[in-house]
């Protein structure tokens, strides 16, 4: 599936005293992009939760390449790297909308559980 990248315009409050985006915001943007991805492929978080399924984060990583500044627009390409019905790994590639410069790459790992915390196979 070829999805349009998720787009995030950097807000002033996301920057730190050094004038660059604080590193923790990249993880938030990854979550925004993941929610977008899940909706686009027909598995919105709302739908999963309505069906009694939760999807906790079991791991996250982000490699920062270039600083991001206020007023930049970040494109986040999201793709499924691994999925076996119980666990899933999502890959994120964050680039500058105007220049294509690579800002960061990241991954998040998730599992699917019922509300009692037992694994659920979505396949």
Ranges and model annotations:
Residues 2-6, 39, 67-70, 81-123:
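HotDog/MaoC-like acyl-thioester-processing domains
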Residues 37-83, 87-88, 105:
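Hydrophobic beta-strand-centered segment that forms part of the acyl-chain substrate-binding groove
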Residues 1-59, 114-123:
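Hot-dog-fold acyl-thioester-processing enzymes
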């Amino acid at each position: 599936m070829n999805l349009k990248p998720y787009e995030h315009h950097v807000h002033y409050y996301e920057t730190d005293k050094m004038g660059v985006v604080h590193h923790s915001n990249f993880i938030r943007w990854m979550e925004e992009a993941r929610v977008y991805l899940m909706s686009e492929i027909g598995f919105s978080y709302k739908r999963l939760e309505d069906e009694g399924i939760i999807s906790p984060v079991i791991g996250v990583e982000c490699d920062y390449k270039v600083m991001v500044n206020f007023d930049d627009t970040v494109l986040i390409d999201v793709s499924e790297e691994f999925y076996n019905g119980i666990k899933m790994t999502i890959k994120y590639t964050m680039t500058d909308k105007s220049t294509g410069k690579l800002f960061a790459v990241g991954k998040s790992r998730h599992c699917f559980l019922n509300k009692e915390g037992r694994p659920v196979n979505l396949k």
